Amino acid sequence: TAQIIHTGEMEGDKLGDANKTGFRSRTFVSADGATVSIQDGNVPKHMHPNTNEMQFILEGTGTVWLGDKEVPVKPGDLIVIPKGTPHGGTKPNGRPFKAIAIKTPPQAPDDTKLLD
């Protein structure tokens, strides 16, 4: 369905229930080859064995784990995460991160492995 998503209006409960770390995610597009969601909050370090991911940072600055490095990110950055790559473990400087996440193929419910 053609649509315009006003990402600036997507806050709090509009993104769904928060998990135990305060992370929220709402999928807006689910197609044959990908899903598109808006994510808000901090996530523990994890990986997806079968899903590639791209995150476009909308709000928040700080660091995230990408592979074996902790890297700084800011609004406007695009993070490319090939399947099997450890990522997350966000450390914001102030406001939690808000990002658009594109996953291909669409992520299965059991395709997240938490890491130390």
What are these regions (language model features)?
Residues 27, 44-49, 90-92:
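Short histidine-centered beta-strand/loop micro-motifs
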Residues 83-109:
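Ligand-binding loop in jelly-roll beta-barrel domains
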Residues 31-32, 65-69:
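Short strand-coil-strand connectors
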Residues 38-39, 47-66, 102:
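Short, conserved beta-strand element in jelly-roll/cupin
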Residues 33, 51, 96-97:
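A structure-centric signal for secondary-structure junctions around beta-strands
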Residues 61-63, 70, 86, 96:
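Structural motif
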Residues 69-84:
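Short acidic-glycine-tyrosine-enriched beta hairpin
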Residues 1-38, 45, 114-116:
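A short, N-terminal "cap"/entry segment at the start of jelly-roll beta-barrel domains
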